[in-house]
């Protein structure tokens, strides 16, 4: 634990020799850009596969993307999202979620789009279940499972549990990728132990995974989905929240004497979210 420590980069006065792009220093870069995205990667020693430097690029407009997603998916569940702009405390938490996902990439973790289908749709409406699973509605931060739109107002889900967190698959990934196996003298000697770890998914389905190569072949490996073990049920819950969003959208965005640009933006986001929900259902039939 505590293997990764974050610090503010030193100033030239504090350390004249420090260079942000030095391969000895992993870094999170804030990019003044209109790009609504973030990326994570690494510089790797080609001789050994060792990661020498992890990099996270946070483009400024990622905050606009997170604001849109959070409002459209769980706005009815969180009063902080029902007034724009959202408070710094919430926006900071949304940025933290993205940074953590990208750090996962920087230490070698690929996406795992199957993880969100490993929890039953009704279970991610249960605060006690979410607490037992580390507070997250998906088994890994490396899924494209954004915010818990399956939860309903009457479920009284803690606000922190609406946002993905480090899950059991992430802990498994760290063990797989970074735990030493002292009894193995060669990589081949590790196989029996690694195969044993892999078989744990037979008992614990939330350790199962899929890869990018399997995209489109598994209806449980969906992007932008929550509770897609039953995509029909989870989409039904999502549509209920989307209807609530539509009912409050004008009140949240309307400002006397101001343009309707934000209303137009969020209305378009709602239509796009409807399309994603429908896509989750149609994936079942191919």
Regions found by a protein language model. Give the residues of each.
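Catalytic Zn2+-binding segment of zinc metalloproteases
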Residues: 103-119
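Metzincin-family zinc-dependent endopeptidase catalytic domain
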Residues: 1-106, 133-136, 147-150
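Conserved catalytic/binding loops enriched for acidic/polar residues
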Residues: 116-286
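N-terminal pre-domains immediately preceding structured catalytic cores
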Residues: 80-88, 115, 122, 126
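Residue-level preference for alpha-helix termini and adjacent loops
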Residues: 43, 112, 140-141
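Alpha-helix termini
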Residues: 62, 66, 114-117, 121
